[in-house]
UniProtKB/Swiss-Prot annotation:
Part of the 30S ribosomal subunit. GO terms for molecular function: structural constituent of ribosome. SMART domains: Ribosomal_S15 (SM01387). InterPro entries: Ribosomal_uS15 (IPR000589), Ribosomal_uS15_bac-type (IPR005290), uS15_NS1_RNA-bd_sf (IPR009068). It comes from the Eukaryota. This is Small ribosomal subunit protein uS15c. Belongs to the universal ribosomal protein uS15 family. Its main location: plastid. It comes from Oenothera biennis. It is found in: Plastid, Chloroplast. GO terms for biological process: translation.
Length: 87
């Protein structure tokens, strides 16, 4: 379990309210929770928290993809997460 996986991205980003910073922090929380849930499979409160954070990150990523596609693709490639699927 890595606590500060994206220190370089976080230290360069001074605006903590920016969409990129929020997505990076949510991604760190998601990775911590998934490693926790591998050992504690019946921790249903953590599962619910993980689903809530996933939804928040998905909403932020969809907002960023609509507003600035270039920043969205750079962030997706940096964090190594999948691109959003549209319905």
């Amino acid at each position: 379990m890595v606590k500060k996986a994206f220190i370089s991205v976080i230290s360069q980003e001074e605006n903590r309210g920016s969409v990129e910073f929020q997505v990076v922090s949510f991604t760190n929380k998601i990775r911590r929770l998934t490693s926790h849930l591998e050992f504690h499979r019946k921790d249903f409160l953590s599962q619910r928290g993980l689903r809530k954070i996933l939804g928040k990150r998905q909403r932020l990523l969809s907002y960023l993809s609509k507003k600035d596609k270039v920043r969205y693709t750079e962030l997706i490639s940096q964090l190594d997460i999948r691109e959003l699927t549209t319905r």
